[in-house]
Amino acid sequence: MDVFKKGFSIAKEGVVGAVEKTKQGVTEAAEKTKEGVMYVGAKTKEGVVQSVTSVAEKTKEQANAVSEAVVSSVNTVATKTVEEVENIAVTSGVVHKEALKQPVPSQEDEAAKAEEQVAEETKSGGD
């Protein structure tokens, strides 16, 4: 009987040792898993923030491009409309063609003149 008791006691010690080692291994594995998850979460957050910033920047660029295209299109339509109204007025005899020959400065010409004035004022010290 003593042999059995001693054998079971040794086996019990082995099981207890294995359980302790298993518990320690599981704890270490849990810590490493937590570290890994936190690392992935942090990197994912950085990537999301960077992606959102990138998308916002591209959206802003596209909005600017669209607005420039719209302004250009509106200017073109306005110019063509004025030309057609002038043609109709001349054709119907309401206005003489010579009366329409007065050149109207374009917005670009006016902007260039304004820039030149600012440059001259800057050179002269604002006097």
Curated annotation (Swiss-Prot):
Keywords: Cytoplasm, Cytoskeleton, Phosphoprotein, Repeat. Phosphorylated by BARK1 and GRK5. It is found in: Cytoplasm, Perinuclear region; Cytoplasm, Cytoskeleton, Microtubule organizing center, Centrosome; Cytoplasm, Cytoskeleton, Spindle. It holds the Pfam family Synuclein. Residues 20-67 are annotated as: 4 X 11 AA tandem repeats of [EGSA]-K-T-K-[EQ]-[GQ]-V-X(4). One of its GO terms (molecular function) is cuprous ion binding. Predominantly expressed in retina (predominantly in outer nuclear layer, also in inner segment of photoreceptor cells, some individual cells located in the inner nuclear layer, inner plexiform layer and in nerve fiber layer). Also found in brain and heart. Sequence repeats lie at residues 20-30, 31-41, 42-56, 57-67. GO terms for cellular component: axon terminus; centrosome; cytoplasm; cytosol; Golgi apparatus; neuronal cell body; perinuclear region of cytoplasm; spindle. Signal peptide: none annotated. Residues 99-127 are annotated as: Disordered. It comes from the Eukaryota. One of its GO terms (biological process) is chemical synaptic transmission. The modification Phosphoserine is found at residues 67, 72, 124. Residues 110-127 have a biased composition (Basic and acidic residues). Belongs to the synuclein family. Plays a role in neurofilament network integrity. May be involved in modulating axonal architecture during development and in the adult. In vitro, increases the susceptibility of neurofilament-H to calcium-dependent proteases. May also function in modulating the keratin network in skin. Activates the MAPK and Elk-1 signal transduction pathway. May be a centrosome-associated protein. Interacts with MYOC; affects its secretion and its aggregation. This is Gamma-synuclein. It comes from Bos taurus (Bovine). The gene is SNCG.
